[in-house]
Amino acid sequence: VYKKEVLYYYLSREGSITHSSDFSRNYDDRTRSVDEVLEFFHEKGLDQIYRDELEYLVFENAYFVPSKEIVLNDRKSIYLDKFREYSLEKYPDLENNRYISELSGKDKILWALLRRKMYAVMVLMSQLRQIRDRVTGR
């Protein structure tokens, strides 16, 4: 469900892992966090019950989102491959997760470009969106 109204505000701090260009730290923090969640579900015997959801959690938090951030900062970073390898090691069929079909239109396009390693097109799309936002005052 998508709503246009703002339901919460959050504070984005300088140096947080969500905006850090220190990809080594970002990789370590994200993979450690995901490992802890996966371990919790495994210990509780819930990892197979929630397999699709956990697989999507890995896709979103340890592959798709960090890869988009890395592409915009350093398309040649080794961490693009490291995040991909980590995620596919956890869930080899991750790219066929049923929840991926529920991505927004923009993210479906970015996902298709990321899978094909068309990083320059991803950067161009981001730059065009920034220009549009400046022109329209968004």
State what each model feature region is:
Residues 31-53, 89-97:
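C-terminal, non-catalytic tails of nucleotide-sugar-dependent glycosyltransferases
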